[in-house]
């Protein structure tokens, strides 16, 4: 059953520019994500869009969840997936959200992310 959906679109250059500030990187991205960004800084925008989509899926915005409590990584084939920590993980457990499906698409200037939170059991 679907718990919720979330979507976001962001300008890639805006996020890339913000990543020039170390404080932005540590506030927004986990250590694993920061390692990923070393190989492709444009992934910073993709990950940020996914984080925004996840908090929209929960209906909380970043009031209840810190951005670095949502980790966006890629599997061996490049498919994005989400790990939740802290308040994000607690919120998912409270609502029985066991799976978050992620889709990312981009142009040269924009990136869009779409997530679906799935309840496997009630």
Curated annotation (Swiss-Prot):
Its cofactor is Mg(2+). Keywords: Cytoplasm, Fatty acid biosynthesis, Fatty acid metabolism, Lipid biosynthesis, Lipid metabolism, Magnesium, Metal-binding, Transferase. GO terms for biological process: fatty acid biosynthetic process. It is found in: Cytoplasm. It catalyses: apo-[ACP] + CoA = holo-[ACP] + adenosine 3',5'-bisphosphate + H(+). The keyword Lipid metabolism applies. GO terms for molecular function: holo-[acyl-carrier-protein] synthase activity; magnesium ion binding. Mg(2+) binds at residues 8, 52. Its EC number is 2.7.8.7. GO terms for cellular component: cytoplasm. Pfam families: ACPS. It comes from the Bacteria. Transfers the 4'-phosphopantetheine moiety from coenzyme A to a Ser of acyl-carrier-protein. Belongs to the P-Pant transferase superfamily. AcpS family. NCBIfam families: acpS, pantethn_trn. This is Holo-[acyl-carrier-protein] synthase.
């Amino acid at each position: 059953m679907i718990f919720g959906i979330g979507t976001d679109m962001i300008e890639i250059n805006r996020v890339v520019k913000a990543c020039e500030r170390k404080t932005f990187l540590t506030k927004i991205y986990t250590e694993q994500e920061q390692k990923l960004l070393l190989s492709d800084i444009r992934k910073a925008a993709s990950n940020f869009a996914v984080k925004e989509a996840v908090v929209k899926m929960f209906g909380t915005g970043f009031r209840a969840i810190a951005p670095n409590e949502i980790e966006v990584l890629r599997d061996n084939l490049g498919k994005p997936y989400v790990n939740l920590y802290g308040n994000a993980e607690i919120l998912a457990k409270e609502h029985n959200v066991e799976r978050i499906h992620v889709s990312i698409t981009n142009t040269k200037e924009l990136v869009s992310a779409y997530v679906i939170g799935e309840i496997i059991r009630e």
